[in-house]
Amino acid sequence: MKIIHIAMQAFTVVIFVYIAAVILSYSIMFVLAFWTLRKERSLDRRELDERFVDAFLSKPVSILVPAYNEETGVIATVHSLLNLDYPQTELLVIDDGSKDGTADVVISQFDMEKADKPADLQLATKAVKEIYRSRIHPNLWLIRKENGGKGDALNVGINFAKYSYFCTIDGDSILDEKSLLRVMKPIIMSDGKVIAAGGNVRIVNGMDVEYGAVSSVKLSGRPFVVMQIVEYLRAFLMGRIALSRYNLVLIISGAFSVFSKKPVIRAGGYNTTTIGEDMEMVVKLQRLLKEEKLGGRIEFVADPVCWTEAPQTMSVLRKQRRRWHQGLLESLWAHRKMAFNPKYGAVGMISVPYFWLIECLGPIIELAGYVYVIAAFFMGGIYYEYSVALMLLLVLYGTVFSMGAVLLESWSLGTFPKIRDVFRMMALTLTEVVWYRPLTLIWRVEGLIRSLFRISSWGDMERVGATGTKGAGK
């Protein structure tokens, strides 16, 4: 029994120190995000959009859409990209050996014919089978290739992209009309010093979508979906805005991001052996910037919005979250020499350690904390008091920061204009700590285990057509 008591006391210290570190980190990020959004809130976005349209004429963009079994949503995605308010783009849909009719619906919908396209084959990829070009939209291309994963599909897109900047969009995502214009703004303002920029990702489930554009913003009726919306707000509005302020970003979403092609090729393109290719690319670019003293920046931009379909069932959400966490560990492990290494500046001393200790390994400690609460409750005595205090701390950082993210979004961007939707999100955050967060912690730990045993598979995500026609995906 003495050993058990010593172990319980030791773990009490560990879990309380961990949660205190998390609360401190989140508090700092919340304050930084607030000040950044407060400054941007005073700007007239329409005036800025008009000012940058002419400047963008010299910055054409190749839009890459890797698609695997995206028959349900790819047409809406392409429509949204064709409707972008942007001076000069080319659109490349890369069909990564889909088993469904992804390529067929694109060919049929956009009246495509076989064509040749020049390529600069600097990145090794799986074989390209066929290339098609739209008769209706000459800037729209379809590239059919052997299956090689998302990273390989993006490398094919880079090889065939004719412009110096490329934008990556998931095959089930849609952009607002001004999104590409706004995500390119920091690149133009920095005269190319910003080599990559990522936009804000929102969940489209429950929205009304017509012709590739969100026509009516509505909050989904599914608690699973609403909790994911809150998670996205917390991750994007708090975490990435704060890290971006000091060039500490290690993740910009692969669902919507823009890169300068030259440094990406210099870094070797996308890693085709990891399932977290989007994060691995950003970490690799940060490493390149520091090792070669290039002085560039990677930024997150809060205003441009990309809408994407989220899982609506527990089984699909589980596959997604364990895949994300597996990709996180794989990316950090591939570049482990950066951790606590002053050679990489603040990225090595602050950002990489944060992702290792809080984001990657944190779920193990936090999940053990839930087990501790249950065990301490039944042990009684002083451990009962510890369990109550720990539960209050879990509620504090799990609920308060989620509510803060919802209020921050409502105040600064106002995606959900209806007050009842905002209150509903806040009400659900009160329940997060007792059902949703424990589940996601378990799935994230599963991702760590799968990474250790080198189990790599994406897992198919069911598409319900939330990006399809009006009213779909509710």
Residue spans for each PLM region:
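Cell-envelope/extracellular polymer assembly enzymes that use nucleotide-activated donors
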Residues: 59-62, 90, 265, 280
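Short aromatic/hydrophobic "clamp" motif used to bind/position activated sugar donors
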Residues: 166
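Membrane-embedded multi-pass helical conduit in multi-pass membrane proteins
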Residues: 354-452
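Long helical/loop segments within the catalytic core of UDP-sugar-dependent glycosyltransferases
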Residues: 117-155, 159, 163, 177-274, ...
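N-terminal signal-anchor transmembrane helix
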Residues: 29-88
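A short, conserved alpha-helix in the catalytic core of glycosyltransferases
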Residues: 263-266, 274-299
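Acidic donor-binding segment of Leloir-type glycosyltransferases
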Residues: 79-143, 188
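N-terminal membrane-anchoring/stem segments of glycan-assembly enzymes
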Residues: 1-55, 240, 369-372, 404-408, ...
